[in-house]
């Protein structure tokens, strides 16, 4: 089964009109580098919204990736609801 078929069968996309999503062919992103997203056909798109603001320095930034990999060896996520954590405090 194609990725988009699995997506349409099992995923809900918030802030998306699902009727239109399900009726039309959609772009599937398979990779990203710097400020560009890459689809299944190898076409490149500018990530104009920085993947909703979480990638303002681009995808696969070496300094950021190194810090993420180091942090994953400690704790992947902890809530800020009543707890503090070292990386956020720095």
Question: Positions of the model-derived regions?
Answer:
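Active-site and channel-lining beta-strand-loop segments
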Residues: 26-48
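Residues in flexible loops and secondary-structure boundaries
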Residues: 19, 23, 37, 45, ...
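Short, functional N-terminal and low-complexity linear motifs
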Residues: 3-5, 31-39, 56-63, 85-87
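Active-site-adjacent loop/helix segments that line or gate small-molecule/cofactor pockets in enzymes
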Residues: 1-31, 50, 75
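Glycine-rich loop-to-alpha-helix module at the N-terminal edge of alpha/beta enzyme cores
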Residues: 44-90
């Amino acid at each position: 089964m194609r990725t988009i078929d699995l997506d349409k069968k099992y995923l809900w996309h918030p802030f998306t009109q699902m009727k239109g999503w399900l009726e039309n062919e959609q772009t599937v992103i398979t990779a990203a580098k710097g400020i560009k997203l890459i689809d299944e056909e190898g076409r490149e798109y500018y990530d104009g919204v920085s993947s909703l603001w979480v990638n303002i320095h681009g995808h696969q930034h070496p300094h950021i990736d190194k810090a993420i990999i180091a942090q994953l060896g400690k704790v992947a996520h902890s809530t800020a609801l009543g707890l503090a954590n070292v990386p956020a405090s720095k």
